C-alpha cells in the first residue's frame, strides 16, 4: 500500500513524503533519498520494491523547500531544472528533512530505520551516516561524497559505483576508501544511474547485484 503524507522538519518546514508499506509487520524502516529528478516514477518504484522486501519505506520530497510536486524526466531539461533546484536549498536544510523522515520511518515501523540514496541522494545518504542517526546507510553513485570524505560515518555504510561513470572519477572513490577502509565499496560494469530503468545507462545485471548486496546489508544491520 502506498500514500503521500506530510512531515515536518525541526525548523517547522512541511514537506510531502511518499510512503510504501509492506504486507505484515515491517522488517525495519527505510528512507529512500531521491536523485536530482524529484520523487518521480522511478523513486516511487524503488520505494515500492523495498516495501515488497518487508521495509516500511518513506521517500521525502526534498525539493519542496524550493518547489512543490517536482517530478522531472531524465533528459537535459530535467537535469538542468534539478540542478537549479538543488542550488536553491542549503544542504543542512535538506538533512533536516531527511532526519525528520528517519524519525517518522522508525516510529511508524517500530524498528530502526536505514537510509538509501541515489545520485545526489547518495551524497545525502553519506551525510546521514556522518551527521544523523540511521541504523545503516547505502549510497549509489554519490558524486559529491569525496567533498565530505573527512567526515567519519557513525554507522555501517555500503557504497555502489559504476566503472563507466563519467561523473565520478575512480580517484575520488579511492580517497573515500583510503579515509574509511571499513566502508564497503562495490564496483559495477555500468555508468552513472545504472540502477534506474528509466535511464539509458540502466544496467540490469549491475542493478540486481547491487540490490542483492543492499538487501543483505540492511537485513544484517537493521
Outline where the language-model segments fall.
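N-terminal cap/leader regions of alpha/beta-hydrolase-fold enzymes
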Residues: 1-222
Amino acid at each position: 500500500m502506498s500514500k503521500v503524507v506530510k512531515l515536518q522538519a525541526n525548523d517547522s518546514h512541511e514537506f510531502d513524503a511518499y510512503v510504501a508499506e509492506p504486507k505484515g509487520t515491517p522488517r525495519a524502516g527505510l528512507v529512500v533519498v531521491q536523485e536530482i529528478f524529484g520523487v518521480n516514477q522511478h523513486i516511487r518504484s524503488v520505494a515500492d520494491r523495498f516495501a515488497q522486501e518487508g521495509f516500511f519505506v518513506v521517500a521525502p520530497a526534498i525539493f519542496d523547500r524550493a518547489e512543490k510536486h517536482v517530478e522531472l524526466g531524465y533528459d537535459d531539461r530535467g537535469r538542468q531544472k534539478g540542478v537549479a533546484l538543488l542550488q536553491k536549498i542549503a544542504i543542512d536544510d535538506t538533512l533536516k528533512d531527511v532526519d525528520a523522515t528517519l524519525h517518522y520511518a522508525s516510529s511508524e515501523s517500530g524498528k530502526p530505520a536505514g537510509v538509501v540514496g541515489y545520485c545526489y541522494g547518495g551524497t545525502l545518504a553519506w551525510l546521514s551516516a556522518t551527521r544523523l542517526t540511521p541504523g545503516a546507510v547505502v549510497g549509489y553513485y554519490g558524486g559529491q561524497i569525496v567533498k565530505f570524505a573527512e567526515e567519519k560515518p557513525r554507522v555501517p555504510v555500503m557504497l555502489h559505483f559504476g566503472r563507466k561513470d563519467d561523473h565520478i572519477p575512480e580517484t575520488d572513490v579511492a580517497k573515500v576508501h583510503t579515509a574509511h577502509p571499513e566502508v564497503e565499496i562495490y564496483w559495477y560494469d555500468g555508468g552513472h544511474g545504472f540502477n534506474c530503468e528509466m535511464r539509458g545507462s540502466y544496467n540490469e545485471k549491475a542493478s540486481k547485484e547491487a540490490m542483492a548486496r543492499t538487501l543483505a546489508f540492511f537485513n544484517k544491520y537493521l
